[in-house]
Structures are given as structure tokens and as C-alpha cells.
Amino acid sequence: MKPSVIGLKCKDTDKVDWKRGLSSYLKRIYGSRQWKEFYDEQLCVEMDHVRNNANGELGAVTLVEQNYKYYAYLEQLYLRLGNNIGQFKLEFTWYDAEYGLVSSPTKHTQKTLVFEKSCTLYNLGVALTEVANEKINEDFKTAMVHMAKAMECFRYLSENFFNSPSADLQTENTKFLSDLSHAEAQEMFLINAINNGTSEKQASLISKLAYSGSNLYENCWEFLRTEEGGLTPYGEARWNSIVSGKHHFFRSLAAYYNALALEQNNKYGEAIAFLKLATQCLSSSLPYKYALNDNFDFDGFGETIKDKTKQLIKDNDYIFHDSIPQSVSLSSIKALDAIKAPKWEEQLKPFMEAIAHKCEKLYRGIVPMEVFEKESIYSEKKASMLRQCINDSETADMEYSSFIEFTHLPNLLSDLKRRYKSQNFSGTTDPQGDMMRDQIQSWIKSISQSKYKDPDEQLKLISSKKQEILTLLAGLPSEQKENVVKLKMALVEAAASDEKLFSLVQPYAAQLRLLKQPDELWKIFNMFSIDESNKQSLLDIDDSKNQEILAKISDIEQMAEDLRLLKEERGRTLKELKSQTNDDDITNTLLVNSKAESEELEVIFKKELDKFKPLTTRIEATIFKQESVVNEVKNELDNVFSLSGLENKTSEEEEKQKKRKEFFMQIEEAATKFLIFNNDLPKGLEFYDSLLKMSKDLAVSVKVQNNASGSDNNSNNGYVSGNVIPPSLPPQPRNVGSSIDSQFQSMNLGSVPTPQRFPQPPAPNSRPIVSMENYTSQFSVPPAHGDLPPAYNQVPLVPTRNYDQPHGSGNYPGNVSSQHPVSSSPIPGAYDQVPMVPPKQPPAEGRSQISRQEQMEREERELQRDPTAFYKKSSVFDESLYSRYSGK
């Protein structure tokens, strides 16, 4: 016997131009200027080529590979676009497979990517069955694997693609093709077991396999069977005969081999009954013999059953006398399905991975928003991990630098090594004391050079700045209440920061005072020095331990070198970690897992972050090793000092050493806190300077606005008393100080906004703070009144500065040659002429005289309060200046 496979036919298709579709999509999305940044013509051509190959006249094995590859391209695109492929404006045309007597296949055209995927998957299943049919006689295992894959393709198609217009893709038809492929794969396994020469020994196994195969073919027969004269639901009419014949033949095989198994178990009566059942099933398959005669030997198998039945009946009659059941059923046999098809996702995975890098380039302009959101979550987790590594690394580097700086380790080791090598002990025998002296001297120098060495003085300076700010704010009108509140809130926050900052140094006022008075400090420090006058000369001390001391110094030098190498290694590893995190991209992973829930996403993120574990572990290892080496260095230094004989001290000397160490630690703590204070205080002072400047600007702006209001009144009075109206200029902003918010947004306690060199134009509908530096060119427009002439309510021309005109030419200050009209509206009469300076006439009424006198007194008071106000106010529209300095 040999297995047979029903031949399936592929679907035909029309050509699709992916190159045109992708380019037109990118042009619509990114515009004609940028679309080429996301377009790769070579990869588009390659995708078109793969589709043509997948539907070409190639060998079955090549067709399988090309269809897998093309489906992977489609799946990658589907992960990005979903069902929005209509934006590509492509049409996919496919024809139904040509089964039976159909003269012309049905044509179906759709614009959905799902239709293209389902048709490709159908052709892939067909190609897999062709490969299985080719490999049946050459390689049974390969054939069975390909048939199992085809079964899974059709199963996936039936469960995931619905409502297709094509008959080939309808759910019931693809379900039938899946069952058919399953049955044929089971058939291959069964016949291979029968043909291996040990079928009788495996009779029980073969009976289970045969019964399972008969059940699978029965499912196919149930789908294909029709009433007499009816049409086959799908495929060709001969398929019904093939499926029915195999169904009955495999039932016969199952009964026969079950009888052999019963005979081996000494159940001769049941064995005879199953042999009779095998004969009946074989008889049922004979009508379909013509369809399977090339593969199955019906006559030979019938003779085998007949001979075996005669033998068992004879043995039972003469020897065993076992009762024969009247009827038996195949249901007593436990069916065994030998086919385990790989999941579709597992089949596609290697091809998805193979083209992933190409699709990242090909589809880089097509990324859904959901993926961007998930990428941002992952990026934050990655950034958090990187920040932690950076902080740990910087802390370790700081600890290393502090240890080297505070111990002066290189100089200390060099000095000790030189002394013990040359046996020159004429200097001090107290290296710890030398180290302390050097360190204290460096602190004294740092504090003496600091501009902020007196915290009390700095506190007074801050208090004076705060008082000045509060004084300025107190003088502001109620209209500026909102800005005043904001500035005062900033002062409160700054005060809290000041309290924390000054609390660092206040507990160490005594130590800082000593550091600013070196003579007094050294006097105290020398009180703890050891009196060497009564000690034995070091020249008389046994120097037999010199070599041991030098060896320990060499060990310490090696440890110091190890510390340096650890720091460099940590820096290199951190740099590599930054590079890898920057280059890391999980877009493709998120696309593949686009339907993952939040819990699944957390697992994916954790797995992706594990990629950086080797680098983060190396950084942690260098930090741990550094701490260990630092402790070893400290211990070895103590051993060196002990071997030097410095440990043989009296109780009084030990007490002095202890007190000196305590004193040094106090000075060290004070110096450390002062360094922090010295670094942070300038930021606070700059912050107060910024608040003060903002307060001054606010006060000056309010003052200037008040002056501008006075100018408005003067202009109105000039119109009433005279016949000439001064030209109106663009309106001045009224709500002063509303840009305080923007200034606060760009300023905090750690940084002060840099003042702009040039004034910026105000934003629409905003009312910025007015600076006195550029206020000389800003004036207020007199309000329009209904009782004024109509021409006054129109926008007048800005006067042209014509120095050739005799009237009023000497009364206009400035060097501007001309000005252009601010409006094109015609203004009749006197408004077309250059406005004249109001004539200097004495007031006709006492009321005008009193008003002018009050105005002059008010301006005199303003000049006394602000002597520079005179230079900040233009004289063009202040007619009082002419009378004030005219001697009248």
C-alpha cells in the first residue's frame, strides 16, 4: 500500500503594483517634500517581485517559500494599518480555483488587505500539499510535516477569515480542506507503520491509527456526500469516491489489526468477530475500488482477511473453544491521532523575523498611534533604568574622588615609600598627622578664597533684598494684586530654601570661624600633637620590618590602580549602555504583540529590558568591588601605620590621637557642608536679584503708566483750549505686569532667566511689563468723544518732519526725517497739515492757571522723588515745559 493525496489547485490573480500604492500613500500622508524620507524604492520592487514569484510557475518547494515570505510582508503591513489598506488605493483581484467543469473561473476584486492575506494563505496550503505529494515516496517524514502544515493553514483560514466572496475561502470549504489534509497526513503515518515490516507486532497501535483515519475521512465524506444526482459542495465529483473508499477501507484495516491484537491477547472469539467485521467493511469499500486501485490492493487484503479468519476459526474449534460474539463495534477501539500540526504563528515566525529589518525600512512611515503610546511607556521604563545606573555610577565616582582627595593617597604612598626605601626618618613620624594638616590647609585656602565665607553677612544681604522687594510691592496699586501675590509667594518659597541652605552651616559656626582664623586653628590642632622630644630616635628603631612595610605599600599602590581601572571600566560600560538604549527600538515587537493586554505588555517590557542586564550588572559589580577595595586600602594603611611602630603609644598619646581625630572629623564635616553652601548660595542670590528686578520693573511700569495718563489729560486740554490737535500714536498697553507669569515660568530657585538685550514685541491680546528704557516712544491715545469733530475720531496721519517749513520747525525735537501715515483714511481740513506746537499764551481764566500750577507742583514733586524722570519723559506733547522754561 501507498498513500495518495487529492490534488488541489491554486487561485490565480492579477498583478498588484505595491510600489505605486506605497508611494502614493506616503505622498498623501507626508507631502511631496518629505515622503521620500520614508520611501525605499528597492524594497518596494522586492516586495512586488516576491508576490509575482508566489503566484508564478515555480516548483512547489519554491512556491511554499515565496508564499510564506509574501504573507509575512502582508502581516507586517497589517500590524501597522489593520483594515485601513484602502488608503493605498490598491485593488486585489483573485480568481476561484478551477475545479470540475467550470469554463471560466469567477473573478473577485476587493481593496482589503484581509482578502489578499486569505487568498495568499489558501495558495500556501495548496502548495504545501503539492510538496507533500512529491515527497511521499522519497521522504515520508517531510511529506507528513508539510501535510500537517497545510492542515493548519486551512484551519487558520477557516477560523479567522469570514464572509469571503470567493468559494475557495468560505468557512465550510476551508474547514473541509483542513480535515482532508489532516486525514491524508494520518494516512501517511498509518501506511508507513504498516509497511515497515513489523505491523503484526504493532497491531494494537495500527488499529488505533486506522480507526482515527477512518473517522477523519468520515468527516470529509459527510461534507461531500449529496443526494443522487446532486452537485458536490466543493471541489470535484471524484473526491467523494476517494474519500468514501478510504473511509471504509481504513475501517476494515482497523478491524483486522484489532483482531490480530486480540489474538495476541488470547481473545480468539472476539478476534474472529472483528475479522468478520473487517470483511464487511472491505466489501463496503469495493464500489470505490476504481478510484483507489492504484494505491490499495483490495483483492490482496481481502485474501489476507479470509485466510486469517479460516485459521482462527479452525484453531478455536479444535483448541480454544472461545465463544464468538454475535456483533462487535469499532467504537471499542481507542482512536489515536498521530498528527500534531505546528501552530500558524510558529510557522510564520521565522519568516517574520527574516524580513523584520526590511519591513522596518519599508514601512517606517506607517506606525499606528497605539504603538507610539506603548513605546513611550517602554521608553520611560528604559530611561528610569538608565537614570538609576547614571546616578549609581556618579555616586561611585564621587566616592572615589572624595576618598582620593581626602586621603591624598598618591602623595601619601609616594612619601611613605620614599622614606622607607631611603631609611630617611629625619622628618615627621606621624604620616596621619601630615595628611590631616594637608587636608586642613586645602580647606582653609578654599574658604579664604570664597566670596561667601561669612554666612551671617550673606543672610543680612538676603534680608535686605527681601525688604527692598517688599517695600516696592507695598507701593503698587491694587490693580497689581495678582502679580504682588505671585512675587510674595516666590519670596516664601525662597525663604524655605534659604532655611534649608543655611541650616547646613549654622551648626558648624565655631568650626568655620576656626577655618577663617588659621592661627587659632593650628594652635588647637597642635595641642593634640605628640611630643617627640622624649621618644626614642627612629634611627635606633629596628628596621627589620621595612621590607614588610614596603610590600604592603606596593599592595596599596596596586589597589589604588585597581580603583582607577574600576572607575574607567564603569565609565566605558555606562557609555555603552547609553548607546545601546539610544539605539534600542522595539517597534516591531510591539506591532507583533499589538493585541497584548497590559499584563502581557509588562512581561514584554521586562524581557526587553533584560537585554541591558549584562551592562547594568557590570556597573553594579564595579561599584561593589570599589567599596571592597576602598575598605581594604583603609585596613592596609592602618597596618602600615601599626608596623611603623606608631601604635606603641602611651595612653596619653592615644587619647591625644583620638581627640585629634575627632577634631579633624568636625573640621571635615564643617568644610564639606560649607562647600555645598558655597555652591548653592549664588543660585539663591541670583534668584533674589531676579525678583528684585521684576519688582522694580513692575513699579516703574506703573509709574510710567500714570505719567502716560497725565499726558492723555494734557492732550485733551490742548484740544479744548486751542485749535490744533496733536497727532495720536499707537495705544500703550494698559494692564502692566501681566508677563509676570511668563517670567516665573522661566525662573526657579536654581536658575535665573537671562534678561533680554532687546525688548520683544507684545503677543496679541497680551499686556506686557513696560520698560522705562523704551517708554519714550510710547504714548496713549486720547479717548474719542461723541461731542468732538468727526475727524478727531479717525486715525490721523503721523506728522511728516519737514525742516523746510517755517512754522513750528524749531519746536520738534529729534532727527527723524519723515513719518508715514498710520491709516489711509482721508482726513479733511487742518488734519492734512503738520500740527503746530500749542501757542504759549497765558491762561484766560483763573481755573486754567490753578490747574497748570497744580500740574507743575506735582511734576516738581516727581522730579524730587525721581531725579531722572525728566530724561524719561518726552517733551513733544508736554506743553507745560515750554511755559515752565520760558520765564512766564
Swiss-Prot record:
<keyword id="KW-0175">Coiled coil</keyword>
<dbReference type="GO" id="GO:1904669">
    <property type="term" value="P:ATP export"/>
</dbReference>
<dbReference type="InterPro" id="IPR004328">
    <property type="entry name" value="BRO1_dom"/>
</dbReference>
<dbReference type="GO" id="GO:1903561">
    <property type="term" value="C:extracellular vesicle"/>
</dbReference>
<keyword id="KW-0963">Cytoplasm</keyword>
<keyword id="KW-0653">Protein transport</keyword>
<comment type="similarity">
    <text>Belongs to the BRO1 family.</text>
</comment>
<dbReference type="GO" id="GO:0035800">
    <property type="term" value="F:deubiquitinase activator activity"/>
</dbReference>
<dbReference type="InterPro" id="IPR038499">
    <property type="entry name" value="BRO1_sf"/>
</dbReference>
<feature type="compositionally biased region" description="Low complexity">
    <location>
        <begin position="706"/>
        <end position="723"/>
    </location>
</feature>
<feature type="compositionally biased region" description="Polar residues">
    <location>
        <begin position="735"/>
        <end position="751"/>
    </location>
</feature>
<dbReference type="GO" id="GO:0043328">
    <property type="term" value="P:protein transport to vacuole involved in ubiquitin-dependent protein catabolic process via the multivesicular body sorting pathway"/>
</dbReference>
<dbReference type="GO" id="GO:0010008">
    <property type="term" value="C:endosome membrane"/>
</dbReference>
<dbReference type="Pfam" id="PF13949">
    <property type="entry name" value="ALIX_LYPXL_bnd"/>
</dbReference>
<dbReference type="GO" id="GO:0016579">
    <property type="term" value="P:protein deubiquitination"/>
</dbReference>
<comment type="function">
    <text>Involved in concentration and sorting of cargo proteins of the multivesicular body (MVB) for incorporation into intralumenal vesicles.</text>
</comment>
<dbReference type="GO" id="GO:0070676">
    <property type="term" value="P:intralumenal vesicle formation"/>
</dbReference>
<feature type="compositionally biased region" description="Pro residues">
    <location>
        <begin position="756"/>
        <end position="765"/>
    </location>
</feature>
<keyword id="KW-0967">Endosome</keyword>
<feature type="region of interest" description="Disordered">
    <location>
        <begin position="706"/>
        <end position="873"/>
    </location>
</feature>
<protein>
    <recommendedName>
        <fullName>Vacuolar protein-sorting protein BRO1</fullName>
    </recommendedName>
</protein>
<dbReference type="InterPro" id="IPR025304">
    <property type="entry name" value="ALIX_V_dom"/>
</dbReference>
<dbReference type="GO" id="GO:1903003">
    <property type="term" value="P:positive regulation of protein deubiquitination"/>
</dbReference>
<feature type="compositionally biased region" description="Basic and acidic residues">
    <location>
        <begin position="854"/>
        <end position="865"/>
    </location>
</feature>
<feature type="domain" description="BRO1">
    <location>
        <begin position="4"/>
        <end position="400"/>
    </location>
</feature>
<feature type="coiled-coil region">
    <location>
        <begin position="543"/>
        <end position="578"/>
    </location>
</feature>
<dbReference type="GO" id="GO:0072671">
    <property type="term" value="P:mitochondria-associated ubiquitin-dependent protein catabolic process"/>
</dbReference>
<keyword id="KW-0813">Transport</keyword>
<dbReference type="Pfam" id="PF03097">
    <property type="entry name" value="BRO1"/>
</dbReference>
<feature type="compositionally biased region" description="Polar residues">
    <location>
        <begin position="812"/>
        <end position="826"/>
    </location>
</feature>
<dbReference type="GO" id="GO:0036010">
    <property type="term" value="P:protein localization to endosome"/>
</dbReference>
